[in-house]
From Swiss-Prot:
Protein name: ATP synthase subunit beta
Disulfide topology: none
Its biological purpose: Produces ATP from ADP in the presence of a proton gradient across the membrane. The catalytic sites are hosted primarily by the beta subunits.
Organism: Pelodictyon phaeoclathratiforme (strain DSM 5477 / BU-1)
NCBIfam families: atpD
Membrane topology of the entry: Peripheral membrane protein
Amino acid sequence: MQEGKISQIIGPVVDVDFPEGRLPSILDALTVTRADGTKLVLETQQHLGEERVRTVAMESTDGLVRGMNVTHTGKPIQVPVGLEVLGRMLNVVGDPIDGRGPVNTKKSYSIHRLAPRFDEISTKAEMFETGIKVIDLLEPYSRGGKTGLFGGAGVGKTVLIMELINNIAKQQSGFSVFAGVGERTREGNDLWHEMMESGVIDKTALVFGQMNEPPGARQRVALTGLSIAEYFRDEEGRDVLLFIDNIFRFTQAGSEVSALLGRMPSAVGYQPTLATEMGELQDRIVSTKKGSVTSVQAIYVPADDLTDPAPATAFAHLDATTVLSRSIAELGIYPAVDPLDSTSRILDPNIVGDDHYDTAQAVKQLLQRYKDLQDIIAILGMDELSDEDKLVVSRARKVQRFLSQPFFVAEAFTGLAGKYVKLEETIKGFKEIIAGRHDNLPESAFYLVGTIEEAVEKAKTL
């Protein structure tokens, strides 16, 4: 165990002096024991000459002073992995933060691991059902694939992620890993209590590095969650779900660290290594022949600008994109998914079947035609449309409302019981609306219901 001494502290960046020729390797973990006996973990980022390293702290550097002893652990940050972490809440370095005693696992993994080799990766395309109509029909998620939830502030990314955790954990009884990256601590607290109440917690491991943490923790916490998920995939042979909320904060923390380390900023002030950092994280989220990791990542879009380098870099890695739109949220349609902007690589008749594909395309064509007619309606009004176009508008508005549905996790806000809709029910409902079988029902009958039968029943009460 090599000992060094702190020579400089600038916020979350700490410089440490070591004897010449004994410098720790880049990414190695160092530990400092504070006066109150607590340990602080530092991660080596740069070598400054022969005797000094620059490190980034994983927790607040309050209480550190120059001259304090630093111990070199000889390896990168290690986190506990195994079945014992299920039902627990950890921080970036794998310490429990739920007040329920230590996590005793037989194994620990480094947070920095190589991506699986090409010959180990599985490329099988298969849809997995979420029970959310708009997603299953128009941008189906693939098992072992990566999905991004794009949206600006307050359009419902976190609620949608929480609904997915709820549906998948209950319906498919798989293991989930949730990484809270730089988001609100209150939301993490709500999620924890909701999971405890619903009984889902026993199949979930939670890792948090929230908004109040220094940038080092926010930059690394996604890797901690990923290492836990990799253990379940590689050693337990499981199909794991990895939820990351929010991947933008990973990039944002990387940008802060980059500036603190004195690197020249790149476009829009982001770090020059943006694409590399994102690639190193995303390349590890893959399915192998042993098991799969299906990931759902919330991606905050700064100022609703999808061309910003942070969301644009993430786009390249995804199999499906769910774009949440403020204009749809303003109509009161939740989940506020934009059906024309969202995409999926597996919406292909060879994978999902002709029936599903044809229904999805018909829905998109109907909504696109309605969008094209909206300018005419705004200027001339509905009366100037042909009878055929009036019918298109009427059906499109019903489809638009039928794409909404009540969520289990939002029962407290809506006062409506949550609904899980099976894929065949979803396809059947939209086919009937497009075929004109429900032209006589009012639009409001289709709003916030599950199946088409519920819409018919609701119409009787209106």
